Amino acid sequence: METHPLNLAHQQHRRADAHLKNSKFDEAMQCHHNAAELLLDAMKTTSSTAALESITLQHSYHLKQKDLIKSKKEQYTRVKKAMENIKTLSKDPQINTQGIADAHGG
C-alpha cells in the first residue's frame, strides 16, 4: 500500500512543501510534477467515479502548484536582486554623500 501511486503522490506533496519552506523552488516544482504523474498512474487503478473525480482534482492542483511556485521563484529572484542592489548602493560613499546632500537641499 505504501508504494501505491496515490500514497507516493502524497509523499511528493509533503516533500514539495518542505522544499518550498527552504526556498528550493526547482525541487518543489519537480515534486509537484512527480505527484501529478503519480496521480495519473493512480487513476488507472480505480473505476470509482468518486475516486477518479478526487484524483483528477488533485492532479489539477499539483499542476497549478507548479505554476504558482514558478511565479514565486521569479518574484523571489527579483526581490533578492533588489536587496543586493540596495546593499551595494548603501556601501557606495559617493551615493551616500549625494543622498545626504539631496536630503538637506544641498
Where are these regions (language model features)?
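Non-globular sequence segments
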Residues: M1-G106
